[in-house]
Amino acid sequence: MRLLILLLLPLVAIAQDDYCFSKDTSRLQTRQFSSKTAYQIVKGTDIDKQYLVPGCQPQKMWIFHRHGTRLPKKSMINKASRVAELRDLIINNYQVARTKPETDALCQTDLIAIKLWKWNSSITPDMEEYLTAQGYEDLRGTAKLYQRYYPTVLTANYNDTYYQFRHTDTQRTTESFKAFAEGLFGSQNAAHPVEIPKQDLLLRPYDYCSSFKNVNYKDEGSEYYKFHQSKLYNDTLADISTRLGFLYTLEEADIKLMYDMCRYEQAWNVDRNSVWCGAFLPEQITVFEYLEDLKYYYGSGYGFPENAHLNCRLVQDLLTHLSNPVSPHVVAHFGHSTGLLTLLTALGIQKDDIKLRADNYDSLTSRRWKSSLIDPFAANFVAVKYDCPADLDREKVVFFLNQQAVQLDWCSVGLCKWSDVLEKYKTIADADCGEYYCRTGGAPSLGSGVGGLLATTLAAMLVYLMH
C-alpha cells in the first residue's frame, strides 16, 4: 500500500500543477483584457491620497468618460451557437477521445464549468452593444466616488447652467450619461444633455476624417501584422488548442471567440468566474493583450504622429472650460474608446520612451501603454482645476485617469501649474482644428484655435466682472 502511494505521488503532483482558473484567488490575467477589461478590477485605489491639495480648493471639473460595460456586436452574438459547439468538442476531447494533454491541461473544476456553460438566450442581435446592468453601475459608481471626494464641485443639486453634459448618439453612451446623472443627483433628476449635432466633430472626429479611417494598421509590414505572424503568437494558438484537447491547431477565429466570451462575461459579472477564461493560461492572455496593445497603439495612439491631432477640438474644449471663471463648472462628455485614446495621445499621457513593436514584446512588460489599464470599460479622464490663493501661480490642475492621478514629468507629483498646461498644449490651443485634426484635411473650420479660445475666455471674464 505504501509503495502504491509513493507511485501515485508524481501523478498527484502533475495534477496539482495544472493551472486552475476557478481556484486562482488572484486571477491577475483579468487585469489584461485590453478594452474589454472590467473597470472594477483595474480602477485606481489611491485617489483618497491624491485629491486633497494643501492650501488649494477645487473649483471646476472636466470629464471624458467612456461608456460602461456593454454587450458584444451582432456578429459575435450570432456566433453563440459556435461557442456551444466548441464546448461540446472540448468535453468530447477530454471524456471520450481522451486527448487530454499531459501538461497544462484543464483542471476538473474548469472542465466542469465549461461543460455546464450556456449562452444567455435573452441577449439577442438587436441588442448589440447595449449597456449592461454592470455598465450602468460602473457609471453610477464613478459619479458617486468623484462626488464623495469633490462635493463642493459636484454638487447634488442639478443646475443646467452649472452642469453641462454631452454624449454621442448611441444607446450605450446615452444610458451611461443617465447612470452618471443618477449617481450625482439621484434617480429622480432633471439632468439633460446638450443637443447632439448632426456632425459630432467634438466627440466623434474620427468619423469625419477619411484618412484616419482608411489607415490599415494591420496590413502586411505593420507591427501588428508582424506580431500576429510571429512564432510566439502562433505557438500560443497551438498551445491553447492542445490544452483544450485538440490534436490540431484550431482556427484563430474560434480561439478568439472563446477569448472574447471570457472577457465579456468577466466584465458582465465582475464577482464571478468567467467560465471561458479557464481555457487559457495566464501567459497566453498576456500575448493576446500585447497584440491588442499594438492595435490601439497604432490605431489610436502614439504609433502614428497624426493620431495626436485628431482630438484637437476636445483638447480645446478642456482648455476653454477650465480657463473660464464662469459656468459651466462641470463639463462631462460620454464617448468611446477611440475618443479617449486619441485624447490621451494628444495630451502626451502614458507615452513610452520606446515605440511598441513586434520584436520588443519581452522588453516592454512594464510599458505605460497598456490598453487594459488605460481603456477598460467605463474608463474616465478627469481634470480638476484648483485655486491656490497663497501661491504665486494660484491656478493648478490634477489629471486623473481611472481614479489615479496622472504623473507627468513637467508637473509636481501629479499637480500641474495651469500656466504650464496652457504652454504645453499651446500648439493645439492655437490650431485651427478644421485643418489640424485630419491628416488630409477634414470638415470646414469652425473658427477654433487660439483666437476662439482667447475670445471666449475674455468674454467670460467680462461677464464675470459685470456680475
Curated annotation (Swiss-Prot):
Annotated effect of mutating residue 67 to A: Loss of InsP6 phosphatase activity. Fails to rescue the filopodia formation phenotype of null mutants
Q: Does the keyword Lipoprotein apply?
A: yes
Can you say what this protein is called?
A: Multiple inositol polyphosphate phosphatase 1
Membrane topology type: Lipid-anchor; GPI-anchor
Q: Where is the active site?
A: 67
Catalytic activity reads:
(2R)-2,3-bisphosphoglycerate + H2O = (2R)-2-phosphoglycerate + phosphate; 1D-myo-inositol hexakisphosphate + H2O = 1D-myo-inositol 1,2,4,5,6-pentakisphosphate + phosphate; 1D-myo-inositol 1,2,4,5,6-pentakisphosphate + H2O = 1D-myo-inositol 1,2,5,6-tetrakisphosphate + phosphate; 1D-myo-inositol 1,2,5,6-tetrakisphosphate + H2O = 1D-myo-inositol 1,2,6-trisphosphate + phosphate
| Phenotype on disruption | Tracheal morphology is grossly normal although some defects are observed. Dorsal trunks (DTs) are significantly elongated, and dorsal branches (DBs) frequently fail to fuse with their contralateral partner. Filopodia number in DBs is reduced.
State the species of origin. Drosophila melanogaster
